[in-house]
Regions:
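Amphipathic alpha-helical segments typified by the pilin-like N-terminal helix
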Residues: 1-13
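Low-complexity, acidic interaction segments enriched in glycine
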Residues: 16, 20-106
Length: 106
């Protein structure tokens, strides 16, 4: 039980950090990275459209969730159509299921 709680705390911290970096990206460029660029746009400059006018590396690497999976990022989001969706698929490793972990709505 404590291990699962620790994993949930880590997911919340990771999503908060990534959320801050996404807001910086958006403030510099006027848009969040689209789904096809994903969170990798925070690490390496996108080479596909829409390309940011003012790109800076905002993180050295995108963390994996505590279960070893990539965080799910969608922009525009399905849940947050004016922003983005960012969540962990949780222990079942399947998106859009009951055990997904969302830290904040963006």
């Amino acid at each position: 039980m404590a291990a699962e709680t620790a994993k949930h705390v880590r997911v919340s911290a990771d999503i908060q950090m990534l959320g801050t970096e996404l807001l910086l990206y958006e403030s510099m460029n006027g848009f969040f990275p689209p789904t096809n660029q994903g969170l990798q746009a925070l690490v390496t400059e996108p080479t596909v459209e829409p390309r940011p006018q003012r790109w800076y590396q905002l993180t050295k690497e995108v963390p994996k969730d505590p279960w070893g999976n990539d965080y799910v990022y969608r922009s525009p989001g399905l849940k947050n159509v004016n922003g983005y969706d960012l969540f962990s698929t949780g222990p079942d490793r399947q998106p859009d299921t009951a055990d997904d972990i969302w830290a904040n709505d963006r």
